[in-house]
Amino acid sequence: MEYNRAAAVAYAKKWAYGRNPAFFDFSDLGGDCTNFASQCIYAGSGVMNYTPTYGWYYISVNNRAPAWTGVDELYRFLTTNRGAGPRAVVTDLSQIRDGDIIQLQFSQKTRFDHSPVVVDAGNGTPNSILVAAHSYDADCRPLSSYKYINIRPLQKRK
């Protein structure tokens, strides 16, 4: 199934400053950014992967895959998935497209911390790329406005 980038972006813009009641809000449990990114990806793909432990799915707050809400877990799922559901590759920032995910690391003491969704890829530079996100709720926020030390652009392939 082809990834519907327009649907992912439309979802991101609709829910950037709100919470879809169909999904739990993880803001008080470590952050909601990857939950929001997963919702956007799902809006664009329409397919979940129900493989226990290593899949990517959300049924309820207590019945979800770690990849649905974890930054590094989402990365591992998207870049290694060979079954149902979305896939991605790490790419150069200049190749990023609307509906892709850009993961950010804010400190040497942590792994990657944040998973904003690209709503406008611009010309592929941090000043022109605009993202939507939860935890640090935003829509059309310039990527360059984040203070990150490392970046991981994930381009959706399916």
Stretches with model-predicted labels:
Residues 118-119, 123-158:
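Glycine-rich, aromatic-bearing surface loops/beta-hairpins
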Residues 50-53, 114-115, 142-143:
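Short, solvent-exposed loop/turn and secondary-structure capping segments
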Residues 1-69:
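N-terminal capping segments
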Residues 52, 104-107, 133-136:
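Active-site-proximal beta-strand/loop segments in catalytic clefts of secreted hydrolases
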Residues 17, 41-42, 107, 121, ...:
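Residue-level marker of positions within ordered structural domains that often coincide
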Residues 58-130:
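...with weaker cross-activation on analogous glycine-rich loops/strands in unrelated enzymes
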